[in-house]
Amino acid sequence: ILHLNPLQEAVQPEGDVNWRGLVDKIADVCARLGKPVIVKEVGWGISAQTARRLIEAGVSAIDVAGAGGTSWSQVEMHRAPTERLRRLAGAFADWGIPTAESLVTAGYVRAELNRPDVHLFASGGIRTGQDVAKCAALGADLVGLASPFLKAAMESAEAVVEEMELLTAEARIAMFCSGAEDIEALRRPGVLVEEK
């Protein structure tokens, strides 16, 4: 998994902002590794242009990790050693492309390039089983979330299991109320997402 964190790098004192030739390097890793390569954003979403470049570079999957989850610019704001860096990082607290928008955009690019073999993952601001169902309806092959589990883990291992069961029940209810018997049915136009 290769993670992309340009904003975080730009607002931290030790950040590396020399990203020249990055797509070529990713393409080289994809060609030489012999294993699936996943590229993950870290909370600001993947644009159409970035999705296109990554798919053309040969990645196997993209985690769009859109805005709405952990804001690494805010993390950097809290650890910044100077007021200037705190202000700089804080200025980008709301930066990014929301997960749903990024997921739909990456899906259009994947379809345009005729690359159904490239998997799309959704993370960033996912909190409920209903969110999971919506991401699946928008084309996510995998949905990731942390916040509900981290909060439950502060309580107990049993609370984590309960959270997992609750999220599963919420997703199933969303599917039931949508008339979708499985994930593929949930993805049909008109079920959760309007036909275009």
Give the ranges of each region predicted by the language model.
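Active-site beta->alpha loop and helix N-cap motifs at the rims of alpha/beta catalytic domains
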Residues: 1-13
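Residues that line or immediately flank small-molecule/substrate-binding pockets and catalytic motifs
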Residues: 2-4, 66, 147, 190
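Short, well-ordered helical secondary-structure segments
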Residues: 9, 49, 84, 88, ...
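Generic anion/oxyanion-binding catalytic loop in active/binding sites
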Residues: 11, 124, 175
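Glycine-rich phosphate/ribose-binding loops and adjacent secondary-structure elements
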Residues: 19-157
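C-terminal extensions of enzymes
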Residues: 149-196
